[in-house]
Amino acid sequence: MSEEWYARPVLFVAHIDRTLDFYVNRLGFAQAWRYEENGKAVVAQVDRQGCVLIFSSQWPDKVGKGLMFISLNVNVAQGQFGAEVESALDKLRVEFETKGVDVKDGWWGYRLLVVCDPDGNELYFNYPEADEARVAEEAQ
């Protein structure tokens, strides 16, 4: 028997509808589902290109304390990794900023883009393998 594991991290938010608006209309995620109690959304899920996030408004004391790494993969020809990664990050930044998203530069041993959602949860968009690939290319 073969098993596959996957994770669906939960970010805690104050208002599901406001959060869905941000992730769907500004970050380009698609709403997968939402759960309501007494006519009010309390849990929802979004996804984009294999990244799945769940939002919950059920624990107010945890709102805005999330940090999520969203690693993006770039298929590139050998010798072109650095330029392709920089181009992909720049395109993502333009996509977000065009939709009114505040994007900051960050560093975690490699370049990343930092976006905060309306509740203060931080999203780090990165290519963690960039430095490894760059070192491998330089060694050749």
Labelled PLM ranges:
Residues 13-17, 69-122:
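Vicinal oxygen chelate
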Residues 1-20, 68-72, 127-140:
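N-terminal beta-strand motif that seeds the catalytic metal site of vicinal oxygen chelate
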Residues 45-49, 115-118, 128:
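Active-site beta-strand termini and strand-to-loop segments that position acidic
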Residues 11-53:
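Core segments of cupin and vicinal oxygen chelate
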Residues 38-42, 63-64, 107-111:
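Short acidic/glycine-enriched loop/turn segments that link adjacent beta-strands
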Residues 56-62, 93, 100, 105-106, ...:
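Acetyl-CoA-dependent GNAT
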Residues 53-57, 114, 123-126:
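Conserved beta-strand in the GNAT
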Residues 49-53, 60-62, 75-79:
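Short, charged/polar surface micro-motifs in flexible loops or helix N-caps
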